[in-house]
Amino acid sequence: MWGHRPKAGEWLIRRSMLDEAAAAVMKCVRIVRKYDVPYVGSCNRKGTKVYIDYELPTVLVHRGKRYEIDRYIVMHEVVEMLFEHQLKFSYRDAHQLALRAERALVQSDGLPWTVYNRFCERWIKRIGSRKSYPNPPPDIDLKPEIDEDDKATLRRMGAKRAAKSGRDSMR
């Protein structure tokens, strides 16, 4: 077992704990929204910055309530980076775990996952359909694109060497 007997309700994720976690991840990275980011959000290779595409709105409004979406994206990117780079999970598995953390945070804020997911799908499609990404972050972590063998996106970013060699570098 885990070494302690859970108290009633301890199996549920508390909103206050998720708010604390979101605040902690927001403090540990700098958010940068001035670049073309093909997968909407990404980190730099050091894990000190989260890049969010310049075009993505910062707020989603649902039933008159405003939801700041940076915290959801940052939670996703930091969890993904931890599992992928520190714990050596594949990008695909790290992404699945990050989605679970992102979803828990979205729902704890009272935003229905279906509403948020629809919003994200629209923007993923819009940003993903660009013919090129002329202004990508110079130190973007390319591991997701490399792991997914997404050579087309790497070329549209101008990362031709990464597309050919699999090296995590924009040069």
Give residue spans per PLM region.
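Active-site recognition of the HExxH zinc-binding catalytic motif
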Residues: 72-84
